[in-house]
Regions:
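Short, basic, alpha-helical segments at the C-terminal edge of helix-turn-helix-like DNA-binding modules
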Residues: 241-252
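Alpha-helical protein-protein interaction scaffolds
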Residues: 218, 254-256
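Short helix-to-turn junction characteristic of helix-turn-helix DNA-binding domains
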Residues: 205-209, 248
């Protein structure tokens, strides 16, 4: 029996332990399916965009031009994007063009701000399919699959409909599971949860600080700093301190400064 696109994606996705690596897999899959770019937002009401552990926008790592990503945040384009607003009202995939006169927008009275957003998008792509994903707690996220040639949009959307729909849902669900694991890792009721002090010490270790330097920073003894670092390594089931830092970064517990 032939393995489908979404099955291959799910198999690879299950091995991803961070939002960053999962997002890169999404971008790779988009290209293999024939889309030029992919984008996602975990909560359509959020105006910020997710970042990598090094502070870079994940969208940039996925292949989006830096100026486009920064403009989306700085100009709060998500506040006025008509596609983002539609995601809260439907579970169906939305096929749309960046041209305000496109088929999706006929019969809709777009506000000037919405028209401006669509025209801004045209500097980077011509059309897209956006798959809304309704999440626990009433939030709605989405994955958008973009193409640079509007003439190919409808056929591309039709040919990849099942794959984009299933992959979009699998991606957001996986991020929800990673999020739950991260929350569990800092839950005081969890015996393996890192304490605030252990996270602090591990954060300084990620910045290259020695045990002696960490002890001075937290105003505790050298032995206390070592104790917290060893506890962190044990709780994260890491082989050493460097491994613990990598695990903590992948789970979003710490950020490399």
């Amino acid at each position: 029996m032939e393995i489908t696109w979404d099955e291959r994606f799910r198999e690879k996705l299950s091995a991803q332990t961070s939002l960053n690596s999962a997002a890169l897999l999404l971008a790779e899959s988009a290209a293999e399916l024939g889309w030029d770019l992919a984008a996602f937002q975990l909560d359509r009401e959020q105006l910020a965009l997710p970042r990598c552990s090094d502070g870079q926008f994940i969208g940039t790592a996925m292949g989006w031009p830096s100026d486009c990503v920064h403009a989306w945040v700085d100009r709060e384009l998500g506040r006025y994007c008509p596609v983002t607003q539609l995601c809260g009202r439907t579970a169906d995939a939305i096929v749309w063009e960046c041209d305000p006169a496109g088929v999706e927008w006929r019969g809709r009275k777009l506000a000037p701000e919405q028209t401006e957003v669509l025209r801004y998008y045209r500097g980077y792509f011509e059309g897209a399919v956006t798959v809304p994903v309704h999440r626990p707690g009433g939030k709605s996220g989405y994955v958008t699959w973009c193409i640079g040639d509007s003439g190919k949009l409808l056929r591309q959307a039709r040919d990849t409909y099942a794959a984009t729909y299933l992959i979009s849902h699998a991606f957001i669900r996986h991020i929800d599971r990673l999020d739950a694991a991260r929350r569990d890792a800092v839950n005081p009721a969890n015996p393996n949860a890192l304490t605030a002090r252990e996270i602090e010490c591990l954060s300084w270790a990620a910045c290259g600080k020695t045990e002696e330097e960490i002890a001075l920073i937290i105003r505790r003894s050298h032995e206390t700093a070592r104790f917290h670092l060893r506890n962190a390594v044990t709780k994260l089931n890491a082989s050493n301190r460097t491994h613990a830092v990598a695990i903590a970064c992948s789970r979003g517990l710490i950020t490399v400064r």
